[in-house]
């Protein structure tokens, strides 16, 4: 339920603002979801309208409104992806493209950025370039239209959360989460939204386990104290025995065999992750990374989570072959 509210709440609110709508993105996003996406769920609408403190403090909301959870999660996600640039200046630039994360890696000072695109398997890989690029309102408007069209076939419930995530990934991967001139713009809007959803779902599970129902008190009034609480677990899995599994094949049809076994490993890890997330009542928003026989998940630091992880691990170990988890 939390992820349904959160993913729906963050939906393209910044795109709406950057497409030429001059209002603040909280109000703009609220009206978009209500009037154009025809979302009538007050829980989702409140999460959009009041996800910034300046609006939340004057809102007449119940103490257990999930807008407080979204506000808190948005701040936590922003702490990790909003970093000031060395020569940053004030103001915002709505035409700012997404920068490459490799610009500052290992002490680099690159100027590469990505072309404005949506994900499309027919397109060539969108490699970063130093050619002059700027986002335009037409692109943002087309992204909003894409998302609006896709929403018509999606029900905002737990069965469609992963589908909604896929829609957002396709449209928001090359859009920066922040266009502040004083900050680095190398985190996509999709990644910020996804991380906000992951954090929010963990916070909800953590507070529920504690029996805490006054979200206003714990996450808004006493937010600074809550930031020090150990609410999260970073959980990783690794498949060992990959090399011997992949390369113990005969010469005949070797290339096809390598591809088949590599694909098998990828699908196996994806299946394990999906099964685990379902048991934990989470979505793929909580999957930080998967690939090469590894994965990382953001989970709630609760006894229930630890118990589920222990049981799942025991079951998986009981069915091991030459591959070990």
Locations of the language-model features?
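Divalent metal-dependent catalytic cores for phosphoryl transfer on phosphate-bearing substrates
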Residues: 1, 5-125, 175-179, 227, ...
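Phosphate/oxyanion-binding active-site loops and adjacent basic polyanion-contact surfaces
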Residues: 22-25, 188-196, 258-269, 309
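Extended charged low-complexity segments that act as oligomerization/scaffolding linkers
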Residues: 34, 38, 42-61, 67, ...
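Alpha-helical phosphate/pyrophosphate-handling elements in metalloenzyme active cores
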Residues: 1, 28-39, 190-219
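Extended, charge-enriched "interface" segments that sit outside catalytic cores
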Residues: 123-177
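Surface-exposed, low-hydrophobicity interaction/linker segments
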Residues: 252-280
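Catalytic-site or vestigial catalytic-site microsegments of nucleotide-handling domains
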Residues: 235-244
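Residue-level detector of conserved catalytic or cofactor/ligand-binding positions
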Residues: 2, 6-7, 13-15, 311, ...
């Amino acid at each position: 339920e939390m992820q349904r509210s959160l993913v729906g709440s963050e939906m393209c609110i910044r795109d709406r603002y950057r497409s030429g709508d001059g209002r603040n993105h909280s109000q703009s996003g609220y009206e978009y979801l209500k009037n154009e996406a025809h979302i009538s769920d007050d829980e989702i609408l409140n999460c959009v309208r009041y996800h910034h403190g300046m609006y939340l403090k004057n809102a007449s909301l119940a103490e257990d409104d999930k807008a407080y959870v979204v506000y808190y999660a948005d701040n936590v996600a922003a702490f990790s992806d909003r970093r000031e640039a060395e020569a940053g200046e004030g103001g915002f630039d709505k035409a700012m493209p997404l920068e490459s994360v490799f610009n500052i890696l290992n002490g680099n000072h690159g100027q590469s950025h990505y072309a404005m695109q949506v994900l499309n398997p027919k397109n060539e890989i969108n490699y970063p370039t130093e050619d002059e690029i700027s986002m335009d309102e037409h692109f943002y408007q087309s992204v909003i239209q894409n998302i609006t069209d896709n929403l018509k076939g999606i029900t905002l419930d737990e069965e469609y959360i992963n589908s909604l995530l896929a829609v957002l990934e396709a449209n928001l991967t090359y859009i920066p989460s922040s266009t502040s001139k004083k900050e680095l713009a190398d985190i996509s809007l999709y990644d910020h939204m996804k991380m906000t959803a992951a954090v929010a779902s963990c916070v909800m599970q953590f507070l529920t386990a504690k029996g805490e129902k006054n979200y206003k008190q714990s996450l808004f009034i006493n937010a600074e104290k809550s930031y020090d609480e150990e609410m999260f677990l970073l959980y990783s899995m690794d498949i060992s025995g990959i090399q011997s599994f992949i390369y113990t094949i005969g010469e005949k049809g070797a290339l096809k065999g390598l591809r088949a076994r590599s694909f098998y490993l990828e699908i196996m890890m994806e299946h394990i992750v999906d099964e685990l997330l379902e048991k934990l009542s989470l979505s793929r928003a909580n999957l930080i990374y998967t690939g090469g026989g590894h994965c990382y998940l953001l989970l709630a630091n609760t006894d229930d989570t630890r118990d589920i992880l222990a049981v799942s691990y025991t079951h998986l170990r009981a069915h091991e072959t030459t591959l070990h988890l």
